[in-house]
Amino acid sequence: MQKLSIIVKDLVVRTQENIVLDGISFSLKQNENLAILGNSESGKTTLAKAITGKIHFTGSIVTNFEDTTVKHARIEFVEQRYSFKNLSGTNDFYYQQRFNSFDANDAPTIFEELLKVYENDSKKNHHYLPGGQATASKADNINSTLEILGIDHLKNSPLIQLSSGEHKRFQLVKALVNPPKLLILDTPYTGLDILSVKKLNNILGDISEKGTQI
């Protein structure tokens, strides 16, 4: 019998005014992928945040992943909005936030932010590389993944200056540099053109075959 990788039981999420999720239960077998459809404000993002431990909930969420060497890399959540620290570490920013020239100079570039993530995950044994390459330098790995989603020309651009579509691609690259056991995507196709959607689908199919659930 195939093992279950995720078990959600009687999940309830409340705000001060509303019950956002009320008694949600489901399970996901290992090697299964899941797409959740629904209108805006129907609770899809709330469910993702509950699974990744970003919000308080009642009920239970159990995850069971095998062959994982780094616990924090088990689950990766690509959100609609990505916040980040400036280089001096004093402020939080997000894409398309109002900024002045000082903010741009103090914001990390795409490459700097990806290199930081890569280094944090460097203890893992496997890194995703387009074309199935076995090894590569940190820079080559990052550049290859940037290129496949069409933003390699922006690698030295400050994050705060990216458009919505560019920022979505950056977030996807960030998750794909070192694929987790579970990848949760919130509206992944927003801001992508048709060619980029096809490329992303190919990447997701590739990492799914290699053990990442989506």
Model-derived regions: residue spans:
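A short, flexible loop at the N-terminus of ABC-type nucleotide-binding domains that lies
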Residues: 2-32, 41, 56-58
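Conserved ABC ATPase signature
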Residues: 128-131, 158-162
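Hydrophobic anchor residue at the start of the ABC signature
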Residues: 172
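Catalytic Walker B motif of ABC-type/P-loop ATPase nucleotide-binding domains
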Residues: 183-187
